[in-house]
Regions:
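Catalytic glycan-binding domains that act on GlcNAc-containing polysaccharides
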Residues: 18-162
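Sec-dependent N-terminal signal peptides
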Residues: 4-14
Length: 162
């Protein structure tokens, strides 16, 4: 009986120790993302968004919404924030750049978060919500997105020590 309890506790500990299902490669990528930002809130926001949006790079392209890269940045928004003309050639070039250049993808995610940070005066729930829904941040979709980002950041701190 004692053997069963020990095995059960080990299994229970293992199943909760990686509740986000992150691999060693995912952790390397997350540490790289973390190194590209200065503020802790920005570091955790970026890591959580990468997990939520692309499963840390496993889903880099969403052609139905035109979102690309680790952070699923919308191509029209990226072109606008980079002051680049919206043409099919530029969309393709920058979509590929978002998918292949972690630094570029991270810089664009930071630009987007900083834009919403200014709009929402450091209210991170609204910032995360707007990252996903724009000015529809009061929507259920936005709220649930922000809530999931908060939960992921908690798990990154508590379970993974990131």
């Amino acid at each position: 009986m004692a053997r069963f309890i020990v095995l059960f506790l080990i299994f229970l500990n293992f199943s909760f120790a990686n509740s986000l299902g992150l691999t060693k490669t995912d952790l390397v990528i997350l540490n790289k993302i973390k190194s590209l930002a200065d503020e802790p809130i920005m570091k955790y926001s970026l890591m959580a968004i990468a997990i939520k949006e692309s499963s840390v790079g496993k889903n880099m392209a969403n052609f139905s919404s035109n979102d690309f890269g680790l952070f699923q940045s919308n191509i029209k928004t990226v072109l606008s924030r980079q002051y680049i003309k919206d043409t099919p050639q530029n969309r393709k070039y920058y979509a590929l750049k978002l998918m292949n250049n972690v630094g570029f993808a991270t810089a664009n995610a930071i630009i987007e978060l900083e834009y919403w940070r200014e709009v929402h005066k450091d209210n991170w729930i609204k910032i995360w919500s707007s990252y996903n829904t724009g000015f529809s941040y009061r929507s259920d979709t936005g709220y649930l997105y922000a809530k999931s980002i908060l939960e992921i950041t908690k798990k990154l701190k508590q379970e993974y020590g990131l």
